[in-house]
Design a protein with these regions (language model features):
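Transmembrane-helix signature of polytopic, membrane-embedded enzymes
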Residues: 6-7, 11, 88-111, 149-153, ...
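Hydrophobic/aromatic-rich transmembrane helices and adjacent perimembrane loops
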Residues: 273, 296-298, 306-339
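Transmembrane-helix motifs of polytopic, lipid-linked glycan transferases
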Residues: 10, 75-96, 134-138, 281, ...
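Loop-to-helix entry region of an early transmembrane alpha helix in multi-pass inner-membrane enzymes
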Residues: 52, 56, 65-86, 118, ...
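Membrane-interface transmembrane helices that cradle and orient dolichyl/undecaprenyl
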Residues: 93-99, 119, 135-154, 158-161, ...
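Hydrophobic, aromatic-rich transmembrane alpha-helices
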Residues: 268-291
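Perimembrane helix-loop-helix junctions
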Residues: 143-144, 171-203, 414
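Signature aromatic-anchored transmembrane alpha helix within multi-pass, membrane-resident enzymes
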Residues: 287-291, 333-362
């Protein structure tokens, strides 16, 4: 491969890493990210945790950087994302025969919305794309000069990649067909005992990464009785058998057409119209020049697209990432057509595509900048305020995304917090309350834990609000704001487990406008203006939209960046408010509010009916039972 391709790869990798580092989430997040951040700091990696390669790299990164686990794992994603973009340069250059075209295609992918958002948080997708691109590159290089050394390199990297994500199996049909088509001695030569043995050894080595997870089963409180049971439990957990059957290839028929609309929205969110058009042209060019490579890219795209399209999960957009990669790769050969117009046409076309990518990066930069996002930490810190294991225990039942954040916060940030899950202690909750009261410890409950306890035990437990946690009403966010203060309120259809309090929303909008405001009924809505006057913008839609306006000479853009029918999980938020090119508000489902100054700096923010809404807390006790407590009771060791 020419040196210029390696130089271009290094340049793009460094530029991408710099971009991701600048917009990096500084710490804790909810959802799977919170789980990864927790597990990487834990001593055991169980089969349920899976991802042995990802966690091995993450643990090494935590040890090398000496950073808190959350920040270190976020940073590892940025580095992996940069490396992935470098690999994309090399693979695209191999497909197109042009380092410039490869670099331009990689830049287009580097600034695509979803990949950028996944490269600034602790997630497996940046490393996944790096390994997909590396596997493809090695396979293409083998086809240039078939030899056992290059074939071993391909087999080894492809097998290694399964330690990060099992969806690498989606590449197997395309890779297999290409190997058979490109084998210089015919397809039968790929089944020679030597090659089969090499492939089997590489596969075994890749599978051996999971020995780490398997071994952890014997270190748990309930170890398996033998290797047979261990393997059954291992397979059940690693492959997520308990929910796989309800999600894979299980999109309801009524939503199939909606998924098509969602995909078109998602594809344009990544590349605009230019990307898909170039990919279509590039695929035609590839088929004409080397039909085997055209078949390879088509099969790789089709398998990953079909899986994501049929995957009934709340964050299907991230599973389209590999298919987006192949769209970007296919765009590179399209640029080489420009040589028919001008002998320097490829370079000119590459520069134009790079400029296009730069314009998209400039436009999306404020919205994708999470460097100032501390919302998850703030939510958990407020929920656990005043708690420590000497004087209190928290019994929680939370949305799973928030609970993952609590797991990290209570194990790494504030390990002195003692907590447990309500489902784990429900059968003996009164005894738990009594025993902790006997040693001077309060028992605090989250809201859903309170509901569960009241339903199970009724008058046997006395439950009252914890005065240490004050949950403001939504309308309180508008109190005492000076007249003329800029604001934006967004209202998105909430998740099914969270209800929208329309009366509270009406009070907020009325307090901001100084008069009643008609409430929205559509899935997406936004209100913007200045306090004391009716909203300058009151827009609602059944489809995602973008609204640009000026509020008191401040340029504001309201972006709805989600497809609510499919999206129940959006780590980057479901939309954004950008004011004066500053990330003023991350929009979530339910109600999101920000008041801000002329420079776009938020003066006050509030959330309701979503996972970032303030969480109430309660204290539970046994009625008419007073626990004698000595003066030293609070200093006794926790029970």
């Amino acid at each position: 491969m020419p040196k210029r391709a390696w130089a271009a790869a290094a340049g793009v990798a460094c530029a991408a890493f710099a971009l991701y580092y600048r917009t990096l989430l500084p710490g804790l997040d909810f959802g799977d990210t919170g789980s990864f951040q927790t597990v990487v700091a834990a001593p055991l990696i169980t089969p349920r945790n899976a991802y042995p390669l990802y966690f091995a790299i993450g643990k090494a990164f935590v040890w090398l950087t000496r950073m808190e686990a959350a920040h270190a794992l976020n940073l590892a994603s940025a580095l992996e994302g940069g490396i992935a973009c470098g690999m994309v340069v090399l693979a695209a250059a191999e497909l197109s025969g042009s380092a410039a075209a490869g670099a331009a295609a990689a830049l287009l992918f580097a600034v695509s919305y979803t990949f950028w958002s996944q490269s600034i948080i602790a997630e497996v997708y940046a490393l996944h794309i790096a390994l997909v691109a590396a596997s493809l590159l090695l396979l293409l290089r083998w086809s240039n000069a078939p030899g056992i050394g290059r074939l071993i390199a391909f087999f080894a990297v492809y097998a290694l990649a399964f330690g990060n994500h099992l969806s690498m199996i989606l590449l197997a049909p395309g890779f297999t067909v290409f190997l058979l088509l490109a084998a210089p001695a015919g397809w039968r030569s790929m089944f020679s005992p030597r090659i089969v043995a090499i492939a089997a050894l590489c596969a075994a080595a890749g599978a051996a990464q999971y020995a780490w997870n398997l071994h952890a089963l014997w270190l748990l409180p309930d170890p398996p009785d033998g290797i047979g049971e261990a393997l059954r439990r291992f397979w059940f957990d690693v492959t997520k058998t308990d929910w796989r059957d309800t999600m894979v290839m299980n999109v309801p028929r009524t939503l199939i057409s909606d998924h098509a609309s969602m995909y078109w929205f998602d594809l344009r969110q990544q590349f605009g119209i230019v990307g898909p058009v170039l990919a279509a042209v590039g695929f035609g060019v590839l088929m004409r020049r080397n039909w085997r490579r055209g078949v390879l890219i088509a099969m790789l795209f089709a398998a990953n697209f079909a899986f994501a399209y049929s995957y009934n999960v709340g964050d299907a957009h991230v599973f389209y990432l590999p298919s987006h990669l192949f769209v970007a790769l296919a765009a590179a050969p399209a640029l080489t057509v420009a040589v028919l117009v001008n002998k320097r046409g490829v370079s000119i076309a590459a520069v134009l595509l790079a400029v296009y990518a730069g314009v998209r990066a400039y436009r999306d930069f404020p919205a994708l900048d999470r460097s100032g996002d501390s919302r998850p930490t703030a939510v958990i810190a407020a929920l656990t305020a005043g708690l420590d294991d000497r004087r209190s225990i928290l019994v929680a039942d939370l949305n799973w995304q928030v609970q993952n954040g609590l797991s990290y916060f209570a194990s790494v940030t504030r390990p002195e917090i003692a907590w447990t899950r309500m489902p784990d202690v429900l059968l003996y909750a009164p005894a738990l309350v009594a025993d902790n009261a006997a040693i001077g410890r309060d028992v605090a409950l989250t809201d859903r834990a309170r509901v569960t306890a009241e339903a199970a035990y009724g008058p046997l437990l006395s439950i009252a609000p914890d005065p240490r946690v004050v949950v403001p009403r939504l309308v309180d966010a508008a109190r005492d704001l000076p007249a003329g203060t800029r604001y934006v309120v967004t209202v998105l259809r909430p998740s099914r487990d969270l209800a929208l309090d329309r009366e509270e929303l009406a009070r907020l909008l009325g307090a901001l406008a100084g008069s009643p405001v008609k409430l929205p009924v559509a899935d997406y809505a936004a209100f913007a203006g200045v306090t004391g006057r009716p909203p300058e913008v009151a827009v609602q839609s059944t489809q995602p939209f973008r609204q640009r306006l000026r509020i008191e000479e401040t340029a504001v853009e309201i972006r709805m960046d989600s497809w609510l029918t499919s999206d129940t999980i959006r780590r980057m938020g479901f939309g954004h408010v950008v004011a004066a090119r500053r990330h003023t508000l991350i929009v979530e489902r339910g109600v999101s509010f920000a008041a801000f100054d002329a420079d776009g700096r938020p003066l006050r923010t509030a959330y309701a009916s979503n996972i970032f809404a303030p969480q109430p807390r309660y204290l539970v006790s046994i009625p008419d039972h007073h626990v004698a407590r000595s003066p030293q009771a609070s200093d006794r060791p926790p029970r």
